[in-house]
Amino acid sequence: MATTEAGLVDGIATTRAAAAPILRAADFAPPRLLANPHLQSVLASSGLRRLLLRAARREVERASVEHILDCGGDVRLQGFLTRQHVVENARGLVVLLHGWEGSARSSYLVGTAARLLADGFDVFRLNFRDHGDTHHLNRDLFHSCRIDEVVGAVLAVRRIFASAPVAVAGFSLGGNFALRVALRAPEAVAYALAVCPVISPAAGLFGLEEGPWFYQKYFLHKWRGSLRRKRELFPDVDWFSAEDLSAGLRGLTRALVLRHTGYASLEEYLDGYSIAGRRLRDLMVPATILTAADDPVIPVDDFHALELPPQVELDIAAHGGHCGFIEDWSLRSFTGDYIAQRMQRHLAPGA
């Protein structure tokens, strides 16, 4: 395992040597007033950042084509393919995965897509089941153990659209999915990158509960809205009781598990999508995990406890919050260049 930990291991990069300088987590150094982890986390998905990214959003979405993918088992997922126009042949195709209750239109995904397109990569932004405006596509609810359909989506993207190597990159829960896709289907991807991935879901749930009130309020508000949308589309299904919907994050998650997943307990479900400890030790493809020591949602100890193969780079910044990494007051994210450089290295090293 290659590890870089800014501020915790003297800021010295111990990742494998590169042919040319490449960004490390240690290079992320926000202004003092921007270093607060909660500010970093909130700004990343803020309305202000969406406003500042409006030109990039227009450019990405103007050239995007919607596709409904057959992911096997009668599951359909929506995604948006955007072709690059800066080189004759694309340097690769990158599948981008959003976080829980995000979407293919989330600011961090659109900003990353714009950066990759500018470097000559095609981009496919996938919506998970029941994310974005896709609740009508499948009758059953989304849950985080639905890895088979995401693997199916990536395989479909590779088969139908890719004329160059394929990589997958994800944020938060999307990072967890990205690493599980690479673990399950190494033939599908040449590289995987995860930003602040959920490692131990039980610890992540506890972190949301014990953190500042606005994190849990934010996710509960979005999740309840998603469940109401599902109920409107499929009124014949007994989705949740009023008591379930008024519960906190743990209570509503437990109700989801017992009513709609087939798992016997909340604990069994959370363990079902854990990638903690030794679970990534058999990962065959090169991968990078970028996180921040001050992430208020995902405990940094989860990353220290990982057992990873040599081709997996673990890069821990001192600051960055949860999927923040906001560099300056223009709200530019460090992750754009960071991801683009690694895609260049792993998908098109000779370009």
What are these regions (language model features)?
Residues 320-334:
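Catalytic histidine-centered segment of alpha/beta-hydrolase-like enzymes
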Residues 308-324:
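Catalytic histidine neighborhood in serine/cysteine hydrolases
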